[in-house]
Structures are given as structure tokens and as C-alpha cells.
């Protein structure tokens, strides 16, 4: 019966405890403590009152809890801008004991003073040894040598946490079983060192850490590495286990140039590579190294004029099976649009290599830019075993509905587009039919997706708002 009771949602478990003495005993050992506006039934109250009610309810629940049997503590306090730190200290002392498996703390960005997470709760080996997932957001965290051994911790997420290089080093040195590490906007970190003792680490994600200058990776089994930020020095002692690599930079940073010169040394065994360039000029160095085992390549570029450089990426990937290109149609220059000339006559675009394993190609944000049209023709002429090619004229993530404009099961929406972007998309459809369709070999599935008529049927203030497909 206790197990069945533990499966009840928080509010249902609380109601049951009000009508039964037996359930009241179970309530005092309730294992899954998830506190947020939704689970506490505060959504119908005025949003400005959420913080007051949430603090009061959570405090009463935890004061009446025995502290035993808690497996998960999830505190979402985004609406609590003025919470007294003593409340948090007390709640953590009650719930974080032996047997705790998951701790998640989300604080408001608008607090005048950041909360300092008490490392002392993990100085006790009983609590430290049982924790499996730790997620902290918008707080101060200062681990020291007194930290207990987190021998079962396999997932660690730090969002906007004020933690130093030294503090993170102490934390990682006690986390031998760590498998996933996510670091987001931790701006006190300058040099991130992933020690070799993290034998089980498989996924490492680093995002927007503004002061980060160096990343040194010594984890011997790292298979997935995602990085989003300024392009810095990154070294991987043994890159052979890496299979999935994602690189993005939010600022103009010559991402593709960086990929040409820096990435081949760490991506020789990578199967999936994603590159997101916020801005790039056309003067990108040729890629002379190889990605011998790369199967999937996905690239985001803003300026379609830079598409010429991508040929070297295709030529450097002899085993490539799938290629996805995202282009921002807002950056089409009027003087670069395909005119009446033959779009395939430029000798620069004549195939130098055959891409014998490339079977699927998708271009999202396809437009009438001359270089992009020639790039598509290059792919058609150099890919003898191509199965399908899709030219999607919508922006961002592409078309979210099927080709008939019907709703998907998830009822996802196409991205909004300006009137100018929609006009360019329709022009791109005509260009594709005139210059590309006739060159597609028989047996290759060829699709040109224009903007969804339902998503972009109405305009307001020159913007096409999200519509339901």
C-alpha cells in the first residue's frame, strides 16, 4: 500500500492524508517532493501571490514531514524573489538525507542576493553516497574538500551557478560515477578541466560560459560533446570515443573557419557533427583534413553566399549518409538572386569528388540565391546514390506540418515569417522548378516545400504569426 501511495501526485497524496490516519503516516514519509506552482494548485491564483503561497505551503509540508524516505526533492522557486535563505536551509536539512536520489533547485533570477547552497548537506556520506542527480540553478555553490563522496551521482546540471574552477574541481573529484555533465552560464569558470577519474562520463555540454577560456578533457569514454559559446582552446586527450559533436557560437566568430582548422584533430571518429555559425564571410579556408567516419552532417549558416565553402566539408566526409543545411533567407542580396543565365555554368561548381554514400539531403531556408542553387546542382551531379533531396523554403526548423498542410499529431506550428520572407520563399519555389527539377535523376525523391498556406494565411504588422498547421 505504501508503494501505491508513493505513486500518487503530490496534491492527491495530501488529500488522502486528510481522510485517513494510515495515509497520514505514509504522507510523512512521502518520497517524491515536487514543489512548483502547478503541483501545489496555485495556477489559478494571482501570479504576484504565487511566491507567498508557495513558501507557506512548502514550509508547512516539510515541517510535518519526517524527513525519512525522501527520494526526490524538486524545488521550483522561480516566483519567490524575496525568500529568506533560512527557509531553504531548513527544507534541505529535512529532505536531503540517506536515500535521497534526486535534488533539483531552481531559484529566481531576480533575487537581490543569490542563495548559497549549503555544501554541508553532502558532507554526510550517507546522503552524499545515495544522490544520483543534482540540478542547481541561479545560486552560489562552493564545494570544498569536506564534500562527501558522491559515488552514485551520474547526472550533474549547473545553470547560472556561481562556482569557481577550484570548487568545480572539488565537486568532480568526488563524482566518480558521473555520466552526464551540463554547465550553462556559469560565468566564474575560466579553465574547465575534466579529469581522467571520470571514467563513466559520456555526455558533456557547455553553454554560454562567458569567461571560459580553456577546456581540457581527459575523460576516457566521452562520446558526446556539445559546446555553445565563444570559440576557445579545447583539447581532448583521447578523442577516439567521440561519436557526436555539436559546436555553436552566438556571436560573429567564423565558426566554419574554426571547424576547418581546429576540429579535425578531435573528430576523426565522429559519426554526427553539427555546426552553428551565427555569421560568416565567404573567405573560409579549405578543409584539408578528413572526417573519415562521419555519417550525419548538419550546418547552420546565415549568409547563403558562404555556401561555397561547404563543398570542402562534403569532400572531407567520404562516408557521409545524411546532410542537413539551414540557411537564413533574410540575408539574400538582390544582386545575388538567380537570373536568366544558366545557374550551373560556373566552373567552380564542377564536382571534384563523388559522394558515393550520401543518400539524404535537406536544405531548410532554401532561397533564390545563385550560390545556393549552384550548390544544390553540385550535390545532384556528385551524388550517384542519392535517395531524396528536400528544399524547404520555410525558416528556422523548417516546415512543421506535412506537405498537404494537415495537422501533425503534436500540433506543432510553422515559424513566423515576414511578408518579404514569404515572397522570397515563393520565388525560391519557382527557381527550384526552373533550374533544379530537370536535373534530378529518376529514382530520386525530390520535394520543394513552400510556406504552409494555413500557417501564413494572415499577416499583422508585417509579420506572419504562428498558425496551427
Predicted segments — roles?
Residues 1-187, 195, ...:
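Leucine-rich repeat
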Residues 33-36, 71-76, 101-106, 132-136, ...:
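Conserved hydrophobic beta-strand positions in leucine-rich repeat
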Residues 419-469:
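C-terminal helix/juxtamembrane-tail motif
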Residues 234-253, 354-356, 365, 382-389:
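Leucine-rich repeat domain C-terminal region
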Residues 268-299, 318:
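Eukaryotic tandem repeat interaction scaffolds
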Residues 89, 93-94, 116-128, 146-153, ...:
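A structural signal for leucine-rich repeat
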Amino acid at each position: 500500500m505504501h508503494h501505491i501511495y508513493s505513486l500518487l501526485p503530490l496534491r492527491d497524496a495530501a488529500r488522502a492524508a486528510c481522510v485517513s490516519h494510515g495515509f497520514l503516516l505514509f504522507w510523512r514519509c512521502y518520497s517524491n517532493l515536487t514543489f512548483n506552482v502547478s503541483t501545489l494548485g496555485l495556477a489559478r491564483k494571482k501570479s504576484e501571490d504565487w511566491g507567498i503561497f508557495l513558501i507557506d505551503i512548502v514550509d508547512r509540508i516539510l515541517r510535518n514531514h519526517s524527513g525519512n524516505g525522501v527520494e526526490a526533492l524538486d524545488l521550483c522557486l522561480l516566483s519567490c524573489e524575496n525568500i529568506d535563505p533560512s527557509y531553504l536551509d531548513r527544507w534541505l536539512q529535512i529532505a536531503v538525507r540517506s536515500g535521497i536520489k534526486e535534488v533539483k533547485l531552481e531559484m529566481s533570477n531576480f533575487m537581490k542576493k543569490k542563495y548559497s547552497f549549503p555544501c554541508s548537506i553532502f558532507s554526510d556520506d550517507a546522503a552524499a553516497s545515495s544522490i544520483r542527480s543534482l540540478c542547481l540553478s541561479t545560486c552560489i555553490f562552493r564545494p570544498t574538500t569536506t564534500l562527501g563522496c558522491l559515488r552514485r551521482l551520474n547526472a550533474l546540471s549547473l545553470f547560472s551557478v556561481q562556482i569557481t574552477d577550484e570548487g568545480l574541481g572539488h565537486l568532480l573529484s568526488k563524482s566518480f560515477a558521473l555520466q552526464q555533465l551540463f554547465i550553462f552560464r556559469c560565468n566564474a569558470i575560466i579553465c574547465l578541466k575534466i579529469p581522467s577519474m571520470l571514467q563513466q562520463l559520456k555526455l558533456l555540454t557547455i553553454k554560454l560560459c562567458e569567461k571560459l577560456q580553456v577546456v581540457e578533457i581527459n575523460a576516457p569514454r566521452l562520446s558526446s560533446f556539445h559546446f555553445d559559446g565563444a570559440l576557445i582552446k579545447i583539447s581532448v586527450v583521447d578523442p577516439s570515443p567521440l561519436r557526436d559533436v555539436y559546436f555553436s557560437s552566438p556571436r560573429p566568430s567564423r565558426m566554419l573557419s574554426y571547424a576547418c582548422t581546429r576540429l579535425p584533430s578531435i573528430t576523426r571518429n565522429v559519426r554526427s557533427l553539427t555546426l552553428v555559425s551565427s555569421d560568416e564571410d565567404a573567405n573560409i579556408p579549405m578543409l584539408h583534413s578528413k572526417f573519415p567516419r562521419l555519417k550525419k552532417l548538419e550546418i547552420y549558416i546565415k549568409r547563403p553566399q558562404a555556401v561555397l565553402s561547404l563543398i570542402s566539408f562534403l569532400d572531407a566526409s567520404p562516408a557521409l549518409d545524411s546532410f542537413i543545411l539551414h540557411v537564413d533567407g533574410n540575408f539574400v542580396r538582390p544582386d545575388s538572386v538567380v537570373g536568366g543565365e544558366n545557374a550551373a555554368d560556373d566552373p567552380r561548381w564542377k564536382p571534384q569528388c563523388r559522394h558515393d554514400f550520401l543518400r539524404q539531403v535537406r536544405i531548410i531556408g532554401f532561397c533564390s540565391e545563385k550560390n545556393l542553387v549552384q550548390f544544390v546542382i553540385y550535390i545532384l551531379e556528385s551524388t550517384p546514390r542519392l535517395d531524396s533531396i528536400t528544399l524547404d523554403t520555410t525558416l528556422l526548423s523548417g516546415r512543421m506540418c506535412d506537405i498537404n498542410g494537415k495537422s501533425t499529431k503534436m500540433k506543432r506550428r510553422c515559424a513566423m515569417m515576414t511578408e518579404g520572407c514569404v515572397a522570397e520563399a515563393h520565388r525560391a519555389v519557382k527557381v527550384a522548378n526552373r533550374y533544379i527539377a530537370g536535373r534530378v535523376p529518376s529514382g530520386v525523391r525530390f520535394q520543394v516545400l513552400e510556406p504552409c498556406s494555413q500557417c501564413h494565411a494572415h499577416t499583422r504588422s508585417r509579420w506572419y504569426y504562428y498558425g496551427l498547421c
